[in-house]
């Protein structure tokens, strides 16, 4: 029985030590932690546009973009791994909408060619030869009949008058209605709404930077061979992207960015291949013919810019590509494609004419206002590439009516441009498609295009937008001191916004040291970006009236302030306003962190990793913090109601004394009134019983028993406990008597309370003494148990050592004895041999 009780006490002691040793953690709020989450937001653009330029890109950029930052900042994030996915990048979709806006804004004031959807009589036209020495051989795929000279009736300035006008059209831009009577119409009249480009419109792309609004950041992957989809370990944060030239083209990527580490091929796991080179291949395109442009009035205030006459070869447009530079890059690209697709049996060829629109089957781009359509068979067909000399010449067509890529069912009429046109660009990549899955024997790879979003994905593959989440919660060892009023600290302004994420790769313990600086950086970064936006808006307010981008930039400004105010409102609801580290009274639940130890959290995890671990419980934690703060507010309200007890000295003020006198008068008046009422009631009761009232000055002795003698002069005799009741007269005597009785009553009650308190303290002291005695006995008993078990363990160890020593000694003796026998046997071998020989001789 004693042994069982000893084990029970030992178990209780161990449990007590375990409970005491386990440290309670509390939810702690941190403001300014380097945490971000993927987000979608409206980016704003920045460019070095020239307001005095009439070029379409400059006009649009002046109205839509802010000036670029002369000192762009980039902050590296060490020890950070981030996932990117270029195929789901919303930045590319936004850029697509922006470039559509650019084109539509450029064409907004131009004339719609609906009045030209009439029947036209057309004949072949070949242009005027300048001289035979300057003529070059026409390419077979261009055709000899290039132009149609068409006549049609057009409305004059007076709507009821018509006149016959003439104009030259390219063969591809008109469709025969009746081949017998040579009637034609424009190719887009029955399918699209055709808009005539303004005569002075030119498309010369300028670099455009996309920037994140305040409260957001742009993550950038700096790995040279990054495929655009997956994890990136070399990450930095920037405010704006690099300058992107919005060049519209198909098949070839012109004037894009280069890769720093070889050729990279990006596959969307369907059929698209985006190729990015690390070297450029120049392409020089020329239209040497000299168009003579004219204008035809087709209605009131409507002018159609047509081609009156062409001098020289009407379609001698071509592009030259250096075979010495193209061939090695194309061969390296083909080898990389074979590695990506995991096949060697791949056919590379150009598209046939019947495999899609001209924009897809040909290289389409804009050169100084003219739309070129070039045949790229000599670039992609191996047999033609081997036959081609230096340089590779691509025959090109020029179209006046073009299917716009911006909207389905929309076309553009590009007015003729006078003079010689020449454009030099750099090929930086390819847009390819392949047919045939992994189970097919043959795979065909051919150039493609048309989906301009792929061009922007190729430029924005290494970027993504994230929102800054500066509020974080984590377990802490400190608990908030309840019901105390503290001074609130105010934030100052600090360095740069991007520096806020500079501690992203640090552990939580290291990053929490710089929370004040990071919080200041966050606010100052918002203020800095607001100032940049505001200056840009003020400088361009007369231009922003023409564009919705002014509203978008103002929305970005308001959004940042709203996000900051929202965070401050949340902190205020939690009682953490103005604090970078705020302790709470909410106990930390270990299940929220998947039972991760306290030291592991603060020494091994970054804030971003910690946020991913507890993100699912954020709502629960925030709700508990808010409930705890509501309870804290209730407690503070109760305390403030008793706050006057903190200033006892104010009790002696003249105002208080007047209040005390008033209360005393009211109490005395009440007592006197009650006394008078009680006397009146007593007199009335006695009168009803037949007695007359005695004088109030008469002392009425109390009645004695007949057998009790009265008290003598010496004080002998039985003294009755009763006393004469004196009836006082007068107001002062009555008040004094009542106050005397009240004070005597209070004195007796106070004496009784002190006696009870003393008795309680005596009992408490006895209980405490008894408890200490029991604790001492428990300690003695536990010490005895520990001594007993220590002695038992020592005896067992000694016995074990003795037994081991005996066994070892016996074993050693046996081994020695066995060795001696073997040794004696070996020594006796010669003697045994000698004895054997002696017996043999006998």
UniProtKB/Swiss-Prot annotation:
Segments for region (V2): 150-189
Record lineage: Viruses, Riboviria, Pararnavirae, Artverviricota, Revtraviricetes
Q: Which cysteines are joined by disulfide bonds?
A: 45-65, 110-198, 117-189, 122-150, 211-240, 221-232, 285-319, 367-423, 374-396, 576-582
Biological process terms from the Gene Ontology for this record are: clathrin-dependent endocytosis of virus by host cell; fusion of virus membrane with host endosome membrane; fusion of virus membrane with host plasma membrane; positive regulation of plasma membrane raft polarization; positive regulation of receptor clustering; viral protein processing; virion attachment to host cell
List the protein's name.
Answer: Envelope glycoprotein gp160
Question: Which is a Gene Ontology cellular component entry for this protein?
Answer: host cell plasma membrane
Outline which residue ranges sit on the Cytoplasmic face. 685-842
Q: Where is the stretch described as MPER?
A: 641-662
Q: Which gene encodes it?
A: env
Query: Which organism is this entry from?
Result: Human immunodeficiency virus type 1 group N (isolate YBF30)
Q: Where is this region: Fusion peptide?
A: 489-510
The chain's coiled-coil residues are 612-646
